[in-house]
Amino acid sequence: MWVDAIRPHVGGLAAASALSGAANLLFRSFPNSRKVVEGVPLYLFFVAMLFQLFVYPHFAWSAWKFTGYDDGWFSQGWGADPMGAAKQHERVWLYAMFGFMMKDMWIFRNDLLFFLHHGIAMAGVLTFFTVPAGLGQFLVGGTVLEMGNLTYNIVLLKGKDSGPNVSPTVKHLAEVLYAIGMGVSNYVGARMFATFTKYDGLKGTYWPWGLGLMWFALIAGRSHVHLSRSWPYFAQRWGGKGKGKAKGKGKSNVRDNAPATVAEVRVTRSAKSRR
């Protein structure tokens, strides 16, 4: 049944993976796009932020708009015609998420953590082609989490560890944006999943348990990264116990030790030579 439900989407998943890979190649061709920031080539930041700013919000909003902004959309499943026009935006959102995960698998083939994280995330996306309810809630919840990832990309580019060409004011604002944005993203994402589990067709089934394990493991990892960076930064600024921890020389080691987050661009030092 699961395989039968996914089979009609194979073409869309393949096309999204190809287009996502093409986006990598396009942005990689720009001047200075291979410059490494926090161990990550700039072009991967650009592609990630493109998806987070435009792709996911656009298709989630368009899917809801197609229903006339019907609140019932959040609790609906695929219905009788999952390949019909009524679910076109939901399909593309999932295709885009899968393609985004897939595009870097070969690049980071030697990074076990990356493979585990992205492999689980892609399996989760495929699972949602069979979800009996709450499809809209998942799309919006996933978009909310991606907006948190957007603030993470911004803080890596313009935060406390960025170069001397970035002003102290901009660095601080980036840290504030991340501290607030990621915290709100995690909280809203957790609340939305709690609502998701109460929908008819999900309540009392195995769905909330399986998906909840992945969802809250993800939020726990994101929260660890979030607090590992923001807590010492603001404690140091306010003269607390974290004094001296946030203001180091060179790159922060938080990213290297942090769990990967959903759709997060993660690059190991060993991957640099392949660029």
Where are these regions (language model features)?
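Membrane-helix and juxtamembrane interface regions of eukaryotic multi-pass membrane proteins
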Residues: 1-144, 158-244, 253-257, 274-275
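Functional transmembrane alpha-helices
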Residues: 143-144, 148-153
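Short hydrophobic transmembrane-like helices used for membrane targeting/insertion
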Residues: 254, 262-267
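Arg/Lys-rich low-complexity patches in intrinsically disordered regions that function as generic
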Residues: 266-274
